[in-house]
Design a protein with these regions (language model features):
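Acidic, surface-exposed loops and disordered segments
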Residues: 1-137
Length: 137
């Protein structure tokens, strides 16, 4: 019964619940068990809003139209583009995250445009600030 949620409360996700969701993502299968995908949990409101504005800019909509629908936490899945299976591996991680969230009564929605976000100068700076290698998308 998992479905995309497009309206969230301002209530933060308890750390214990968030950690369970993240753990499920880390146990996702990957091609050749290379485990190239990483998960960046953005819980800081200022950083979350920065990413929301960047995503809105890519959508070519006003920044007040939050592409993250007010979700208090944004989980970003990135994988090493040198791995030929990185898109599939990242997709499996996202599926595990979303199924775990549902099982813990936490709503989720797959939001696209991360690749485009992190190709911008602002996006590249964000990844660099978080010590994410350039080869990840």
């Amino acid at each position: 019964n998992r479905r995309s949620i497009r309206k969230y409360t301002k209530q933060s996700i308890p750390e214990e619940i968030l950690n369970q969701i993240l753990l499920a993502g880390t146990y996702a299968p990957s091609a050749k068990n290379q485990q190239s995908a990483i998960i960046l949990a953005v819980t800081n409101k200022e950083k979350r809003d920065q990413l929301s504005a960047l995503n809105a800019k890519i959508m070519n909509v006003d920044a007040s139209k939050d592409p993250f629908y007010g979700a208090p936490v944004v989980l970003i899945v990135l994988a090493d583009k040198n791995n030929p299976n990185h898109v599939y591996d990242g997709s499996l991680v996202m599926q595990n995250l979303m199924l775990a969230a549902k099982s813990l009564n936490v709503g989720s929605c797959w939001i696209h445009r991360a690749k485009e976000m992190f190709e911008t100068q602002e996006g590249k700076a964000f990844l660099k600030q978080h010590r994410i290698p350039d080869s990840y998308e």
